[in-house]
Amino acid sequence: MLFRSGQKKRENRQAVFLAETPFGHAEGSSLRIRLKHQSQHAQHQFGRVRLAVTSSGAYTEKEIPLKLEDWYSLGPFPTEGLSQNHGPEGAPIDLQQAFPSGGKVLKWAKETKYVDGQVHNLSIGDNTSLYLYRSIQSQSSRRVSLSLGSDDAIKVWLNQAQVMVNDVNRGVAADQDQAVLDLKPGANHLLMKVVNYGGASGFY
């Protein structure tokens, strides 16, 4: 992965290359970098170059954004309340897994219509639960804040650990709840459950 800064005229340029996998060992490592300069103007010069290797997480924390994978939904399930577990809670998420419910078999479905930062209607019916899942890819360990909204109740897990719960009856709006996510390097698994006690339903 490459991050670049310094795009203005007469401004120093900086490029940061992030390795996809860790490298290096106690006996030493050899790193080869090839640089090529191309310009349509003959007077352009490559300039001075300084190379350095670092294990600092400063760039990944400040400059490299998180990668948010697609949303998936599971349900709706007839429910007795927010505490009722319909299968995926507290366990590794398997998007191929099927869940029996009321004589039917429910499976995870990709939801390409969900856009972050917007309120989405779920239309799941009275006294039902719906699960929402996505993977969050992080280059490093970092803490982020998650803003949520729901109609009605909501519960959130990260990597199988519960991080937020609000058993409430309300209409959905932006920024009704906040959760803190302690992300680890690599894939992080975010699971949410929305319970509709009656009327409209949705999430933010």
Regions of interest found by a model, annotated:
Residues 1, 46-48, 54-120, 135, ...:
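Accessory carbohydrate-binding/adhesion or oligomerization-edge regions at the termini
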Residues 4-13, 120-130, 167-172:
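Extracellular beta-rich ligand/substrate-recognition surface
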Residues 13, 155-204:
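Beta-strand-rich ligand-recognition modules
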Residues 30, 46-48, 143, 153-155, ...:
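Exposed beta-strand and adjacent loop surfaces of beta-rich binding modules
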